[in-house]
Amino acid sequence: MSQPRTVAVVVGSLRKDSVSRKLAKAFAALTPNLKFDIVEIGDLPHFDQDLESDPPAQWVRFRKEIAAADAVLFVTPEFNRSVPGALKNAIDVGSRPYGQSVWNGKPGAVISLSPGAIGGFGANHHLRQSLVFLNVPLLSQEAYIGNAFSLFGDNGELINEGTAEFLRAYGAAFSAWIDRIADDAPAAKAA
């Protein structure tokens, strides 16, 4: 049996007990055929092109972790109809130096969430715009998780079966997408 494909998970919220982090962990548990690793972004210094010739160790670590993965999953809350600043910074750090983006050709998916009913629609679409520009082949199926604060029990476990079923289906679609992109990898990287 072959090794499961690895997925770097970038969680947009920095809060230790964030609902985004809980959702990322629940998604990983519901998608057992993939290996998920959360890549921390909270310690990344702000992107500054002046630092590219001698990049901070945190940038180097982040870029290596993303580059080593077969795919990337973004799980993000919505802040002011967009993505959190820390997530945008991580995207910028990974996109540099010019011509060496760790995102290029790496299959991806986006899950957005919010306490309201629209599930982070604005964040999801803003993030997708950046990722398409960076040549991340994104799963076309979109995932908006609304009323996110009501989905978890006191111990952080996902208690909403409808959401669990949706995430299982999304995980199956993402897994198939990763396989499809891996089969077409030379063409995707050349784009």
Model regions: which residues?
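Short connector loops at secondary-structure junctions
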Residues: 37-46, 143-150
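N-terminal beta-loop-helix "entrance" segment that forms/cooperates
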Residues: 40-58, 154
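A general structural signal for well-ordered alpha-helical segments in protein cores
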Residues: 7, 20, 24, 44, ...
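A generic structural motif
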Residues: 31-37, 136
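N-terminal beta1-alpha1 ligand-phosphate binding loop
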Residues: 2-33
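Helix-loop-strand module that forms the ligand-binding subsite of alpha/beta enzymes
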Residues: 55-134
